[in-house]
Amino acid sequence: MTFLPQEFIRKVRDRAPLDTADVARFVQGVTAGDVTEGQIAAFAMAVYFNELPLSARIALTLAQRDSGDVLDWRGARLNGPVVDKHSTGGVGDLTSLVIGPMVAACGGYVPMISGRGLGHTGGTLDKLEAIPGYDVAPSVDMLRRVVRDAGLAIVGQTAQLAPADKRIYAVRDVTATVESISLITASILSKKLAAGVGALAMDVKVGSGAFMPSAEQSAELARSIVDVGNGAGMRTAATLTDMNQALAPCAGNAIEVRCAIDFLTGAARPARLEAVSFALAAQMLTMGGLAADAHDARRRLRAVLESGAAAERFARMVAALGGPADLVERPERHLPRAAAAAPVAAARAGWIERIDARALGLAVVGLGGGRAKIGDTLDYSVGLSALAELGERVEAGQPLATVHARDADSAAQATDAVRRAYRIGAEPPAQTRVVHAVIE
């Protein structure tokens, strides 16, 4: 029988039972170009309003995985598991830059397919492109070599990996259907499965700087990713983490790379960044069979940080992908620096009781360090550093942050935006945990 995309879309629209074979045929049509952009848009909107049952989410994920190349690491003679992490994105979230090297130093192999920032969230690829010469789009053969030799490679999605997802996402982005939990789930997991990942630690953000607008929706997304990932044959766990303030005390591409280097070398390890990084990396080690339990995993992770093995893995990856061989030893020589810097003075004395993390991210976008739309050119040097945290006591005139900008005018605009993102009160706020819950 001839497959008609419009009949399949009608079933999704009407919440009729879906044949998993029809899901696969629809995705095959997307890849081949037989399904039009209008039909993709209609499908995405139908899913947005109705969502998909678990069986159809799994089928959609597997079909998107199979729309292109699927990396098979069995012939690469790796002596450890292939594991990965993924975050729904936030502000000051540089965990990928430290978790990948830590896990690689513990014996894991991490082919991390990452994305660019859009809106208020920072993108891992944008951070890495602040490193001169770093190639975020190597060939599949180069990706294999770097993962085998360095233990990790943090790169972008190639044209050969999950091409159907790329086409569907492009339509979602312009049809107000990005927020569909079913489509988010399939998009994330199809790329991870195409990369040949055996176990995935998922970081789902909650709070003012999170991608999902509510804690309930964040939890729903985490549950969906865990159920679909495991249903598709990839061991998956999700951690709900706090994004009511920047995760690290900085935001901006080159600034975050420097923060990651400081973390790996021990120059500075901010507590919130350390808590989330250790939680996710420990999950990767235990799911991959590299540690007996969370306590054993944390002991191993601490050891590779203190010995310098994790920093060495990061340096090896950077050099293998075209970056400076001495980046870890001399970051100030290679990373771009903004021309202007300005402190953000607190308007009054008191306790920091609320931070609008989304506003901080948008301040970086306003400086030129993020994208208002796809295709925007970035200034990798700009951003924020020394961000004050929730619950801190500040005096009037005390710096809440430092703005790094291309000129004095843009620094002044960002200074006002950052100051407005902080609410200072008379009483200290209730303390909140950075790791809210784990879903397995």
Swiss-Prot record:
Its EC number is 2.4.2.4. GO terms for cellular component: cytosol. PROSITE patterns: THYMID_PHOSPHORYLASE (PS00647). Gene3D superfamilies: Nucleoside phosphorylase/phosphoribosyltransferase catalytic domain (3.40.1030.10), Pyrimidine nucleoside phosphorylase-like, C-terminal domain (3.90.1170.30), Transferase, Pyrimidine Nucleoside Phosphorylase, Chain C (1.20.970.10). Keywords: Glycosyltransferase, Transferase. The keyword Transferase applies. Pathway: Pyrimidine metabolism; dTMP biosynthesis via salvage pathway; dTMP from thymine: step 1/2. It holds the Pfam family PYNP_C. One of its GO terms (biological process) is thymidine metabolic process. GO terms for molecular function: 1,4-alpha-oligoglucan phosphorylase activity; thymidine phosphorylase activity. It is an enzyme of class 2 (transferase). It catalyses: thymidine + phosphate = 2-deoxy-alpha-D-ribose 1-phosphate + thymine. Belongs to the thymidine/pyrimidine-nucleoside phosphorylase family. The enzymes which catalyze the reversible phosphorolysis of pyrimidine nucleosides are involved in the degradation of these compounds and in their utilization as carbon and energy sources, or in the rescue of pyrimidine bases for nucleotide synthesis. This is Thymidine phosphorylase. It comes from Burkholderia mallei (strain ATCC 23344). The lineage of its organism: Bacteria, Pseudomonadati, Pseudomonadota, Betaproteobacteria, Burkholderiales.
